[in-house]
Amino acid sequence: MFGNNLNSTLIQDLDRLENRLREIPLEPGVYFLRDQNGEILYIGKSKKLRSRVRSYFRPSQPLSPRIALMVRQVTEIEFIVTDTEAESLALEANLIKQHQPHFNTLLKDDKKYPYICITWSETYPRIFITRKRRINNQKDRYYGPYVDTRLLRYTLHLIKRTFPLRQRPQPLFKDRPCLNYDIGRCPGVCQKLISPQDYRETLQKVAMIFQGRTGELLEKLATKMLAASENLDFEQAATIRDQIRGLQALNTDQKVSLPDDTVSRDAIALAKDEQHCCIQLFQVRSGRLVGRLGFFADSQSANEGEILQKVLEEHYLSVEGVEIPSEILLPCELPEGEVLAGWLREKKGRKVELTVPQRQSKADLLAMVEKNALYELEKTKRSADRDLQSLQDLAVILDLPALPHRIEGYDISHIQGSNAVASGVVFIDGVAANQHYRHYKIKNPEVKIGHSDDFASLAEVIRRRFRRYAENPDNIAESDDFPDLVMIDGGKGQLSAVVAVLGEMNLLEQVKVVSLAKQREEIFLPGESSPLETDKEQPGVQLLRRVRDEAHRFAVSFHRQQRMQKSRRSRLDEIPGLGFKRQKELLAHFHSLDYIREASLEQLQQVTGIGEQLAKEIYNYFHPR
């Protein structure tokens, strides 16, 4: 059932809230929580919809800060009724995958644990390590996150030595393959010396390794090697033999060997305190530990069973059925374990058991997982203590009324005024929060080639960042992204420019601002002619330096990106009828000017917005008669 989207939130209109709750049935199903813009904040499931949704708005119900923030934004509730709990779980999983709501991530986005990504969306997919899961293309596959980064890098290194794979994001040469092809590390995808089908077949074998199916892959390769030998194709047989040896070496390097190698199983456990919750999931295949995944969750969100239930739902939502093990070992019963087991069975195509182990070998495995979860918790607490110490020290140095929960850092990057850009980075509780980072293109016409003006650029950025607070000061109290401290990369001049703008906007009292100069690591405060006397090794100063360095890095990388885009577009600007929008479409499709130059008329016409006549203009520009 779907309702109308209204501007007032439900907690501001209790009559409408109560009427809305009465409309929701006491049946299994899926519910949607929307904000005033109609965006889905959260998708959930329940065997009793009304009871579950009402719990969010019950005054006596304790909510974590994250969930409380979500509830304050809810303006509408929608729901879909299902026949069974299993149906609601399957529907919830599909809807979350489709809409990716902001508050549906129980697991925190911790960048220290990397993933393996295979870009199946590309004609010749790449495989690489990344610390961020992107949802731009549903065809791409992510495996992980992996706790042991060194082992992961070694594994990928060994795989690339065993199987010929694409090595570069872009070709090194446009008319010939690079050295990787000559030494057998790459099949020459840049020159299309292998068909996409054959290349994908190779990559499917690699994917089996990260799915925990190395034993199955070894059996397949052994069969192929025997067939090649019988057909007198000894070169192919030798290639497969080398691949088998590489995989066997990889298998030997696994650190833990376990009995009962006939069953694939995952074992999960957590360790938590009032502030932190660390989850470890060990993947055991053919009696060997092939993967160790780590997750962080909101420790205030639920009890142990509820957290584990949600973690498993989120984890197995992102994996293929063939990757789901036959058995999952748990430290406790799950609140909806039967529903989860039914959903996993449907996805895998065979029975999946959720077990609280009684046998000694399984209990020992689970104890090892719990021990690792506790170790990660202690490590996280030590890191949090260091961050807290830095914040406390910084508050003392700058005489702040409270700890700076949100710190923002700003920097300008340009080359003699050309392509001037700015960065805005954010640190939450002393930790970089790159999901809140922002780029700014400087629009001031006085900032141009040959005339750089960092002061004017910073003034423009600060004016744009705080405009909505100057227009309506009430926004400050209602905002969840107003900074406790603003750090400017620069000296007294840069700080004075920012202070002047904040004064014009009547925000000088509300915005605490400092600057940090690079040369001597000097900290300047508004109204002070001399820098603060500090020790560069103080925790608070080191935190400011991290913010400053991150703002600088982010600004420089964006400036470099803008220069590259401008240099590519400069040639395209000369083509009649090719505007900015179609230039973007061309570059998005072909990725480089060289590929556009080499494209045929038919290939050019495949680009969105490029008709026959414009394709001829582009082709003739690069191929003059």
Swiss-Prot record:
Main localisation, per the record? cytoplasm
- Keywords annotated in UniProt: Cytoplasm, DNA damage, DNA excision, DNA repair, Excision nuclease, SOS response
A GO CC annotation recorded here is: excinuclease repair complex
Pfam assignment, any one: UVR
Q: Any idea where this protein resides?
A: Cytoplasm
Q: Which GO terms describe its molecular function?
A: DNA binding; excinuclease ABC activity
Report the residue ranges that make up the UVR domain in this protein: 215-250
Q: Name one GO biological process term.
A: nucleotide-excision repair
Q: Which residues cross the membrane?
A: none
**Where would one find the signal peptide in this protein?**
none
Give start and end of each GIY-YIG domain.
26-105
- Superkingdom of origin: Bacteria
| Coiled-coil ranges per UniProt | none
Q: Which InterPro entries match?
A: DisA/LigA_HHH (IPR041663), GIY-YIG_endonuc (IPR000305), GIY-YIG_endonuc_sf (IPR035901), GIY-YIG_UvrC_Cho (IPR047296), Hlx-hairpin-Hlx_DNA-bd_motif (IPR003583), RuvA_2-like (IPR010994), UVR_dom (IPR001943), UVR_dom_sf (IPR036876)
Per its database record, what is this protein's job? The UvrABC repair system catalyzes the recognition and processing of DNA lesions. UvrC both incises the 5' and 3' sides of the lesion. The N-terminal half is responsible for the 3' incision and the C-terminal half is responsible for the 5' incision.
Q: How does it assemble?
A: Interacts with UvrB in an incision complex.
- PANTHER family xrefs: UVRABC SYSTEM PROTEIN C, UVRC/OXIDOREDUCTASE
In which family does this protein belong, per the annotation?
A: Belongs to the UvrC family.
Descriptive protein name: UvrABC system protein C
> From what organism does this protein derive?
Microcystis aeruginosa (strain NIES-843 / IAM M-2473)
Q: What is the lineage of its organism?
A: Bacteria, Bacillati, Cyanobacteriota, Cyanophyceae, Oscillatoriophycideae
